[in-house]
Amino acid sequence: MMGSGLHIAARRTVLLFGVLLGMLAVASMVGTKTAYASTFTVNSTGDKGDQDTNNLVCNSTPLQPGIDPECTLRAAIEQANDNDNEATTVDTIKFSLGGDGVQTISPNTGLPVVFEPVNIDGYTQPGASENTLAVGDNAVLLIRLDGKAAGFASGLNIAADDSTVRGLSVTRFSFSGGIGLSGADNCKIEGNFLGTSPRGTTAGLGNGFGLYLQNHFANPSDSPLANTIGGASPEARNVISGNSTGITFFGGLENKVEGNYIGTTKSGIDDLGNSARGMEVLAETRDVSIGGTGAARNTIAFNGQDGVGIPSADSTGSSIMSNSIFSNGGLGIDLGASGRTANDPDDADTGSNNLQNFPVLSSATTSSRSTTIKGTLNSTPDTIFTLRFYSNPSSIPDEGKKFLGLKSVHTDATSGEVSFTFRPGKKVAVGQRITATAAELDSNTSEFSNPRRIVAQQ
């Protein structure tokens, strides 16, 4: 009997241990659900919301055995918002919509604000592909988000850090913006057409803002930080054209705008201008980086007003580097009040980008072998500045169409004056107009200088 009792006790112990292990396993599964990213695949262009945001299944219609659930973009965003993932875990929204060609999603009201990190990837739609061209854009976009029926709403409003939106055409959110970032940090907006159809050439489909960045609507002290619009590789290029304004910063710190076409068709050459500014930096926005080297340079052209406008006195530190800026209705770069801001002695004034003084070009000559550009800069004494030089055709002389190169100079400690001579790597044709900008290293870029016509060297 004792042996039998011990045997039964042992069996109970093993059984209890097994039950405990099972409970721990279940508890572990429940406790670690948040450690795994979820993927939701949009398979319907409809606009119904999710039936049950607690089941980790995107289903905008009741679940039926043996039938794949319908998943709309609205339902997918609701699931991504409510699946209890950790803030460091990024969900993915993919697309697999039946039918050939472009699939259009037309919400009847604004889509939910994105509160949890998510990667919304239009290039997952079968047949879509990223841009591979260094010049121009051959991306195949097959998902269009159209706001004609959405009322006063943005196409997508991202309020979650570490989110990405790529591969979408976003059109006709005319009362607001195509994509908004509200207090979100470290997000990427890349490979989209904002304000034009997936063809990348169609006018009349613009948003109020192609893209806007603003402080968080529930926490105004939370500014968007370190987001990248575009990027330095071909697949990251956005076409932001045909809107009222291309990109607007209503706040933010250390955001980047790189490699985009702002105001052109996807060719990067033809006119599809935004009706107002190509880009505007407002309301305590600081340290925006616009452009860069190589593929990070933006093309900003054909916009109805300024190419880049920084009117707000409390918006400082922005760098506008090596872009192609031309054929805009206003100035290529406009600081402060509308129109050219005059230089002042030692650049003692303050305001947007500190109202940085621009260089004064005294001569520009071309010989049979080279081009020589001379001039002066008067600005903050004993300070290192980066000068950037551009050439322009005579028909559009006073912006910066073709970047020629840069030069560092150091102003005199007493007078704030420095003279310079710059020779670009390739000679510039007689008749071209030269302009230049000045920046404190790579901060607080000035307006373009007055143009100087290239003449033959005697």
In which residue ranges do the predicted regions lie?
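Sec-dependent, cleavable N-terminal signal peptides
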Residues: 1-38
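Small-residue (G/S/T/A) turn/hinge positions that recur once per unit in extracellular repeat modules
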Residues: 160, 184, 215-216, 224, ...
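Long, low-complexity, polar and repeat-rich extracellular regions
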Residues: 281-285, 311
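Fold-core signature of tandem repeat domains
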Residues: 179, 189, 194, 211, ...
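N-terminal, post-signal-peptide segments of secreted/periplasmic proteins
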Residues: 26-190, 196-207, 234-242, 269-273, ...
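Long, polar low-complexity repeats
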Residues: 156, 209-218, 225-227, 277
